[in-house]
């Protein structure tokens, strides 16, 4: 008993010594994590070189665009054919993908041989042979009468220019067909099929096997965005952001990049990592100096590396007693399969002995232990190198997405990964150590290359179908020049109806007289108070207007809130609160008890009877103070001032914010005779000839008309321009049937239009993989600021995804492009409609004055106009196009409503004083 224990101990020690000896000998092949991270860093640099336009020609890692722009989302369906050509045999496959809630793939396939004489004959012979095999397969399945889409896996070095165009760079793997190199292989197949004339197919995509692997796995796991092959050769692909791919135009979306990573190190980047054995393998290969990384990791070379190490150790008398056999000296006699077998057996030492005996050697126990260890070191290095380059790819994807923790799946194929007993496990373990902030899943591809080509085709079909469906839906929102001219014409008609005494009562565009009869002329001076009430906060302002050399406006203001109970209380309580705030402000400014002229911006629907008399028609914006509707707001304010008995104010003017905007800009630019607001709501005003303002007596001079143009279309005159989405937004609004024009152009509603379109797309499976989240059903989540952010040019899709994520919408890159497109279409229409309305206004002013050309300035305010990246530009272009005889400038108003009220007061005081003289 003791003897057997001693013997076992002796062998264990012996094995241990032998292992240490090999470890020391192959010290350079055992890579630390530090070294692997350094390799990952170098690989990152090589990736960037391959992607850059200027560095691509000299880059060793080519990073080739594949024109595959999306991975499967599980909704693909249909029948497809696939051809898989990558060696002496090729396969034809029929693939049916069904999506009825249960993703299912059915396949039929047949393998055809390519005879030696055809491989080395002409290209015409080769492609005729392929077409013949395809015809035979379709005959067998009785599908020759169908024109099916086909995906083609072509695993040779190619330059791809489109999804269905791929030029062969050079034959490999023993092929020598003449007249094919430099040609597009898709054209060659198409011609061969046409020569036969007995069937037709639609060749949609050419892919290589790595992309096929990613796509096959992507159908089962939508997180799959990397494809990896470690077999006879090695390569990888991954989904890159379009903005980083200099060789392909366009910045939006993603595209799969075929890395061709086998060539990593061809420029010397791995010289300090490569060993003498790697150099020897390379020198004896068919392509010296090329594919150096592949030669360190792939199955074609793994057994050969082990053989070279054993030969050198034997020559140095470290193995086999210094003896060599002819078999051991013959290239290719130690196979990668032997490496797998030796490492796979529980008793690997015994397997090592079998292999060594087969090679004509007489190994000792130590020799077998050493051989086992050499196999381990070579295959472990291979897995570690793969992990290092994958770590670089994952880091890049993680940075592209800006995620703190990345969840990603790698689709894998290849004999080394699948058949070596420990390779996969070592690869997974090392990779997780190198990228601890990534959760990685590995998915083995079953039948990657053939099924993958069908999947690429299925995805291309799905994308094309979905694109067509989306364009059809968005078509009614895209307005032609003729349609915009018609909107302009109708706006003009509605303006006339609002101005006319006869039709005013029934006109939706009310064209209300404001009793503001002049814009500033620059001689205004004095101190004025202004009140600005249009929401839950209101402002009190002191505005000092100076003329002469010191001409300008100086402002002081303070914001006060209106508590909910005051908004919903009595009118007296509301106006007492306002007067209390004025008193506080005057004290704050050190002007207690001073009497000043006051201008009042009151942004609620009113009927104005004179400059200082304005009857509130109805409260909006959540106000409900009783006893105010039907009353003159100036009287209510004056009564509250008298009740306080602390100061007296001369209320000179009541205006709305649009008029305020025009007056503020009019102080800077005497040509300013139009005011426009495009923010939460939208409205416009302009200087109309008194003779046309039939509601007010007098023919001389001009008066500013508050158009209330948001109600344009309330009589149905815009129904042929309104879409189902406009109708849906209107129905669910607080004032259904009212303010229809405003609902097509203003910030409060654009987000809702977008949300309704997105819901429609999602219901039809065109977006968010057909899943409607609770958030998407929530009204009002798409604020205007998000529309502005999403359309911002400097924002990458990554940030669009972040905005959608913030809104609780999980989106793919493709989804983000679609959301951006919808936002663009909706905002563009809004800007064009606004421009058409404005063109009607400026043309009316020109015609009123009988001018051939008019130079006029529009004062503008509002968040949509100011913050949206494209709204203003599109609106300006539209006005220019639809009113070519008007030279229109746009001036952004700074603080229109408060300052404007003070300026109207200043103008009124100037005119009053002139009248008194």
Curated annotation (Swiss-Prot):
Residues 73-207 are annotated as: Hexokinase small subdomain 1. Residues 656-895 are annotated as: Hexokinase large subdomain 2. Pathway: Carbohydrate metabolism; hexose metabolism; Carbohydrate degradation; glycolysis; D-glyceraldehyde 3-phosphate and glycerone phosphate from D-glucose: step 1/4. Residues 208-447 are annotated as: Hexokinase large subdomain 1. Its EC number is 2.7.1.1. Monomer. Interacts with TIGAR; the interaction increases hexokinase activity in a hypoxia- and HIF1A-dependent manner. This is Hexokinase-2.
């Amino acid at each position: 008993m003791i003897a057997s224990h001693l013997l076992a101990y002796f062998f264990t020690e012996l094995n241990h010594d032998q292992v240490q000896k090999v470890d020391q000998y192959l010290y350079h092949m055992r890579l630390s994590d530090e070294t692997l991270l350094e390799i990952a860093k170098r690989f990152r640099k090589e990736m960037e070189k391959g992607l850059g336009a200027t560095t691509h020609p000299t880059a060793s890692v080519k990073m080739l665009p594949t024109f595959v722009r999306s991975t499967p989302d599980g909704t693909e369906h249909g029948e497809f054919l696939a051809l898989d050509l990558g060696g002496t045999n090729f396969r034809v496959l029929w693939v049916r993908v069904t999506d009825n809630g249960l993703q299912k793939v059915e396949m039929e396939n047949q393998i055809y041989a390519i005879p030696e004489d055809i491989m080395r004959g002409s290209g015409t012979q080769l492609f005729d042979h392929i077409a013949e095999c395809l015809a035979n397969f379709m005959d067998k399945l009785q599908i020759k009468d169908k024109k099916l889409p086909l995906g083609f896996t072509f695993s040779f070095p190619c330059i791809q220019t489109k999804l269905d165009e791929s030029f062969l760079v050079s034959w490999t793997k023993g092929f020598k067909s003449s007249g094919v190199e430099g040609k597009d292989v898709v054209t060659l197949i198409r011609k061969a099929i046409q020569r036969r004339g007995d069937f037709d197919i639609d060749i949609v995509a050419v892919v290589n096997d790595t992309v096929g692997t990613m796509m096959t796995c992507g159908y089962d796991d939508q997180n799959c965005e990397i494809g990896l092959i470690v077999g006879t050769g090695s390569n990888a692909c991954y989904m890159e952001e379009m903005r980083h791919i200099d060789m392909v135009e366009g910045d939006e979306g993603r595209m799969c990049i075929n890395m061709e990573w086998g060539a990593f190190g061809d420029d010397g980047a791995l010289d300090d990592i490569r060993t003498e054995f790697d150099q020897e393998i390379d020198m004896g290969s068919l392509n010296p100096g090329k594919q150096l990384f592949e030669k360190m990791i792939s199955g074609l070379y793994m057994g050969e590396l082990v053989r070279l190490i054993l030969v050198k150790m034997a020559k140095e008398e470290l193995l086999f007693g210094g003896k060599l056999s002819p078999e051991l000296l013959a290239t290719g006699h130690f196979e990668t399969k032997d490496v797998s077998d030796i490492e796979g057996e529980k008793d690997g030492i015994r397997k090592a002995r079998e292999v060594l005996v087969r090679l004509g050697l007489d190994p000792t126990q130590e020799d077998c232990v050493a051989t086992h260890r050499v196999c381990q070191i070579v295959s472990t290095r291979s897995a570690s190198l793969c992990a290092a380059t994958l770590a670089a790819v994952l880091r890049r994807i993680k940075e592209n997405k800006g995620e703190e923790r990345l969840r990603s799946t790698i689709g894998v194929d290849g004999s080394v990964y699948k058949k070596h007993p420990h390779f996969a496990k070592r690869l997974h373990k090392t990779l997780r150590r190198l990228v601890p902030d990534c959760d990685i899943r590995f998915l083995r591809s079953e039948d990657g290359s053939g099924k993958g080509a069908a999947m690429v085709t299925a995805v291309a079909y799905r994308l094309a179908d979905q694109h067509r469906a989306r364009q059809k839906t968005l078509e009614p929102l895209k307005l032609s020049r003729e349609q915009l001219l018609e909107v302009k014409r109708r706006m003009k008609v509605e303006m006339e109806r609002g101005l006319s005494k006869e039709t005013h009562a029934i006109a939706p565009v009310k064209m209300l007289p404001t009793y503001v009869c002049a814009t500033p002329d620059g001689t205004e001076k004095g101190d004025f108070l202004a009140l600005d009430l249009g929401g839950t906060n209101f402002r009190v302002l002191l505005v000092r207007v100076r003329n002469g050399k010191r001409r300008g406006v100086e402002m002081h203001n303070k914001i006060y809130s209106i508590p909910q109970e005051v908004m919903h209380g009595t009118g007296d309580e509301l106006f007492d609160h306002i007067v209390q705030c004025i008193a506080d402000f005057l004290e704050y400014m050190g002007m207690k008890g001073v009497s000043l002229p006051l201008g009042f911006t009151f942004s609620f629907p009113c009927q104005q009877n004179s400059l200082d008399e304005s009857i509130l028609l109805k409260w909006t914006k959540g106000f409900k103070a009783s006893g105010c509707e039907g009353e003159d707001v100036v009287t209510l304010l004056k009564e509250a001032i008298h009740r306080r008995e602390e100061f007296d104010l001369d209320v000179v003017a009541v205006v709305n914010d649009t008029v305020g905007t025009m007056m503020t800009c009019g102080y800077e630019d005497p040509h300013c005779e139009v005011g426009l607001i495009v923010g939460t709501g939208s409205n416009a005003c302009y200087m109309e000839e008194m003779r046309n303002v039939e509601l007010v007596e007098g023919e001389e001079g001009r008066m500013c008309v508050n158009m209330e143009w948001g109600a344009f279309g309330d009589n149905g005159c815009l129904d042929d321009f309104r879409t189902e989405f406009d109708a849906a937004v209107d129905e669910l609004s607080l004032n259904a049937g009212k303010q229809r024009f405003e609902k097509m152009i203003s910030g409060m509603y654009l987000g809702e239009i977008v949300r309704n379109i997105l819901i429609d797309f999602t219901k039809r499976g065109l977006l968010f993989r057909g899943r409607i989240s609770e958030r998407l059903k929530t009204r009002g989540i798409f604020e205007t600021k998000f529309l502005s952010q999403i359309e911002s040019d400097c924002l990458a899709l990554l940030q669009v995804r972040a905005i959608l994520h913030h809104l609780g919408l999980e989106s793919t890159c493709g989804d983000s492009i679609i959301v951006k497109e919808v936002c663009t279409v909706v905002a563009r229409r809004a800007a064009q409609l606004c421009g058409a309305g404005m063109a009607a206004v400026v043309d009316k002013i020109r015609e009123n004055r009988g001018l051939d050309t008019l130079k006029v300035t529009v004062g503008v305010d509002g968040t949509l106009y100011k913050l949206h990246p494209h709204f203003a530009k599109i609106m300006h272009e539209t006005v220019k196009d639809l009113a070519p005889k008007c030279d229109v400038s746009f001036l952004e108003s700074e603080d229109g409503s408060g300052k404007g009220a003070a300026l109207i007061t200043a103008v009124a005081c100037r005119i009053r004083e002139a009248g008194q003289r």
